[in-house]
């Protein structure tokens, strides 16, 4: 066969083999084009897992009529124009292959309008030579791309497509990843005419955790440690889950972004894994959502056609920077300082995201105020990342006024010879997770009871009862109100006059519990609930709570928290060993009084002596 130039359609189909792997690949390329066009809202409509229809609609800047034909041509792009642009890419797309490749293996229609145009125009390519036809259309400012019958002309590729559910799950994962990268854009994902995902745009940093919880789930949000780390031109932001409380489900959450581009990079994963290796088991993986910002000239994006990988010009520097950033946050978790009564406590800094995920900031036993103050983190020179390193996860002690003077006074006091004085009274040791424990979980009995071994005795513990006590502790406000979590879609309910009066009387108490609402003539709108209620069926629970309040003459936060704890649905109809161990660890940490004096219905000793005596008499 002689050497010949391939027809345009065949050449595009060959390129599609690298770019268009499955429907999710199409969604990724088209949504990234929408983001590059400055869209603030992107609607994704899918039918039959993307095999029948993929429609991407955005409100971006649109494409001019005279550029529509070029948009469907190979190697035509508005992102780069020279080698200098290629070496400093800031856009998501730049190859100019996506639309041409997709149109060669599907029936693609491109409709767009710019703000300067009075009407929209529609373009589509067909035939062996991929000739583009342009005609007038009706469309608002922005762009809509419809991809029909993906792989209709490449049967071999269509055979490799999975089930409709599997393909849509891949699309759902792609939208999750993109939504985590662009908090300022609204994403709506529909499948077979039904809205499946809606991620609303958030503007403020404090609201980013709202989307983080919606995408990654409440368990990750509860254990998330915020990171803000910088050195020179490198910046690392995001969240990493506390390795001490990382579960198997959380290990699937591993998202990293380089200059806003989602990546699967071994170097980044290795740096994070190395920082967490002392706290992770051999079969555990870290969970994280991290954003690395670097000078575009220091990273090569033009490595893989699908742009999943990058190369760093100073890979060792990037690796060590990420390692130090993650390690510093984890070290701050475990470091404590020597309590010195001579030093006045520094002003408390309560970050937006909890520094010590899972630490009890709800109800705590009565103790001196100084004991409840969290220890100020110590500066660790080995995790500084150089003089340019900084960290916003907590206030540094040397940043407080008069710190150096206080340290000098303490140092001189330590050097003085103590005078003879009576021996101090013994102080009871602080309660920690090792000194007080329910014991070791041996097995699960009956699906909802844990068989425990502690100090040579066997006991049976009711897991639903333990979970109820944990929920009550999480819902009971301590020194500060329970943190309210805004609902993505507020719950609007119709209430009677008595119920409305009861809500108004208990509004301040409900606010302390993290339940925020607004009321009008005959309705109440629930806008926020505490974190333990985010996964509950609020359309059932909240009306029952309102009915309970309407029957009460007096209100107390303890009683309301107790009622909610008794009426929430358990997250585990059938308990596993891992779930039981995690629950008991939380109960031991948040409800230490239950370990000392277990209430009725929680713990039941198992009489092994009677059984042993019966066996001896056989």
Swiss-Prot record:
Gene Ontology cellular component annotations, sorted alphabetically: mismatch repair complex
Gene Ontology biological process: mismatch repair
GO MF: ATP binding; ATP hydrolysis activity; ATP-dependent DNA damage sensor activity; mismatched DNA binding
Low complexity bias: start-end ranges: 367-381
Entry keyword set: DNA damage, DNA repair
Pfam families: DNA_mis_repair, HATPase_c_3, MutL_C
Biased composition (Gly residues): 382-392
Taxonomy, superkingdom: Bacteria
Chain positions covered by the region annotation Disordered: 367-403
NCBIfam families xref list: mutl (TIGR00585), PRK00095.1-1 (NF000948)
HAMAP family: DNA_mis_repair
Family classification: Belongs to the DNA mismatch repair MutL/HexB family.
Function: This protein is involved in the repair of mismatches in DNA. It is required for dam-dependent methyl-directed DNA mismatch repair. May act as a 'molecular matchmaker', a protein that promotes the formation of a stable complex between two or more DNA-binding proteins in an ATP-dependent manner without itself being part of a final effector complex.
Name used for this protein in its record: DNA mismatch repair protein MutL
Organism this protein belongs to: Salmonella newport (strain SL254)
Gene name as annotated: mutL
């Amino acid at each position: 066969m002689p050497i010949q130039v391939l027809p345009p359609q065949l050449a595009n189909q060959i390129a599609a083999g690298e770019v268009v792997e499955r429907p999710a690949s199409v969604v990724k390329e088209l949504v990234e084009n929408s983001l590059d066009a400055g869209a603030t809202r992107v609607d994704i409509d899918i039918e039959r897992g993307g095999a029948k229809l993929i429609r991407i609609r955005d409100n971006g800047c649109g494409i001019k009529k005279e550029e529509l034909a070029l948009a469907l041509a190979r190697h035509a792009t508005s992102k780069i124009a020279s080698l200098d642009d290629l070496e400093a890419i800031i856009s998501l797309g730049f190859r100019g292959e996506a639309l041409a490749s997709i149109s060669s293996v599907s029936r693609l229609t491109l409709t767009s309008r710019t703000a300067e145009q009075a009407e929209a125009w529609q373009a589509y390519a067909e035939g062996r030579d991929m000739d583009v036809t342009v005609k007038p259309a009706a469309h608002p400012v922005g762009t809509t791309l419809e991809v029909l019958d993906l792989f209709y002309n490449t049967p071999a590729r269509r055979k490799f497509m999975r089930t409709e559910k599997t393909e849509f799950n891949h699309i759902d994962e792609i939208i999750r990843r993109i939504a985590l990268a662009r908090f300022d854009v609204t994403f709506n994902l529909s499948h077979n005419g039904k809205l499946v995902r809606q991620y609303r745009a958030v503007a403020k940093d404090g609201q980013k955790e709202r989307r983080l919880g919606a995408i990654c789930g409440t368990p990750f949000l509860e254990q998330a440690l915020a990171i803000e780390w910088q050195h020179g031109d490198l910046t690392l932001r995001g969240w990493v889950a506390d390795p001490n409380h990382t579960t198997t489900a959380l290990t699937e959450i591993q998202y990293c972004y380089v200059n806003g581009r989602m990546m699967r990079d071994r170097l980044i994963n290795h740096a994070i894994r190395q920082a967490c290796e002392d706290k992770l088991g051999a079969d555990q993986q870290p969970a994280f959502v991290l954003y690395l910002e670097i000078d575009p000239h220091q990273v090569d994006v033009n490595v893989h056609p699908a742009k999943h990988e990058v190369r760093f010009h100073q890979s060792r520097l990037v690796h060590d920077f990420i390692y130090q950033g993650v390690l510093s946050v984890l070290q701050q978790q475990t470091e404590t300082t020597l309590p010195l009564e001579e030093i006045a406590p520094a002003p408390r800094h309560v970050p937006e995201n909890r520094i010590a995920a899972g630490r009890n900031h709800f109800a705590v036993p009565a103790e001196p105020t100084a004991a409840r103050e969290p220890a100020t983190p110590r500066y660790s020179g080995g995790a500084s990342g150089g003089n340019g390193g900084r960290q916003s996860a907590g206030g540094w002690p040397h940043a407080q006024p008069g710190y150096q003077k206080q340290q000098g006074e303490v140092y001189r006091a330590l050097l003085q010879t103590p005078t003879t004085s009576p021996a101090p009274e013994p102080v009871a040791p602080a309660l920690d997770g090792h000194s007080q424990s329910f014991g070791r979980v041996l097995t699960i009995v009956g699906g909802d009871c844990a068989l425990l071994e502690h100090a040579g005795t066997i006991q049976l513990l009711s897991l639903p009862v333990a979970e109820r006590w944990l929920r009550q502790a999480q819902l009971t406000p301590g020194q500060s109100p329970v943190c309210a979590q805004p609902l993505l879609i507020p719950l609007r309910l119709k209430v009677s006059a008595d119920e409305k009066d009861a809500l108004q009387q208990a509004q301040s108490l409900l606010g302390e519990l993290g339940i925020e609402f607004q009321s009008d003539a005959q309705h109440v709108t629930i806008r926020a609930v505490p974190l333990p209620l985010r996964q509950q069926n609020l359309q059932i629970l909240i009306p029952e709570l309102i009915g309970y309040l309407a029957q009460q003459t007096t209100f107390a936060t303890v009683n309301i928290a107790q009622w909610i704890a008794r009426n929430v649905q358990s997250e585990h109809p059938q308990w596993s060993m891992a779930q039981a161990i995690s629950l008991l660890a939380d109960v031991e940490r948040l409800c230490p009084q239950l370990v000392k004096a277990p209430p009725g219905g929680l713990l039941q000793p198992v009489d092994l002596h009677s059984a042993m005596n019966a066996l001896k008499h056989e």
